[in-house]
């Protein structure tokens, strides 16, 4: 039985996390799908499809849709694979979201999963995208970090919203993020009890920002950005190190960060400060859709 939801209840969230954990342990994967519809372009669109068998959640499809080019992740319990559950979930997703203005669908998976399931791409008629992403992890060892008198890291509030949006838009506009999407990210991060939006001030001016997602079993850093004129001066690593040290005192989680493989500089920075590669996230497009764009 498949149930479609635009938002998960606490019980469903708990079941989903249990299934994700089970699949990760079995497959050797690391990436947690996003279990909120907070950033989706239409909050009414079904974003979670749950497949139950005898009262147990054995399949999950999640939809990440900050714009009309949506990303889908499908997870099936190891004991229930090759029974058509993934297909059934995707068919349900197509049917339930047909009335919403979706332009394209991209599947998210991990390199290790594709290596262990080499027929998956062909069986589903998919083609691998050139863009890939590396997820890196770090243990709870703190950094030796001296205070710098003219630098300050603060938990942001709404008075900084415009400055943060402007900085993020300049940093990430090449990733085809519209200003509207960036504004939504910032506004929701400020509201979300599971997020912490930090800013780095230099002489009182916002020169950096980073969001920490606390909703999974790691402190997940994303959207770390330094303003253009201040790059290459060590401020990115200072902000990351400061946040690691602070969060070690606040919770008992380890750390994760994701970076596009094309962003060689950022990847090098994270590796230099002790983050270690966990997995490569791969994006798969439907063949027809990809061909029609070319």
Residue ranges: model-predicted function:
Residues 1-35, 146-177:
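Short amphipathic alpha-helix that is part of the acyltransferase structural core
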Residues 24, 32-97, 110-111, 210-219:
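Conserved donor-binding loop and adjoining core beta-sheet/short helix segment
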Residues 24-53, 175-211:
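Active-site rim helix/loop that mediates acceptor-substrate recognition in acyltransferases
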Residues 67, 78-149, 284-286:
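Acyl-donor-binding surface of acyltransferase catalytic domains
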Residues 72-74, 105-109, 221, 255-259:
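Conserved hydrophobic beta-strand within the GNAT/NAT acetyltransferase core sheet
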Residues 73-83, 224-232, 260:
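A short, internal acetyl-CoA/4′-phosphopantetheine-binding micro-motif in the GNAT/acyltransferase core
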Residues 82-95, 226, 232-249, 267-272:
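Conserved acetyl-CoA-binding loop-helix of GNAT-fold acetyltransferases
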Residues 130-160, 253, 258-264, 279-294:
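C-terminal "cap" of GNAT-fold acetyltransferases
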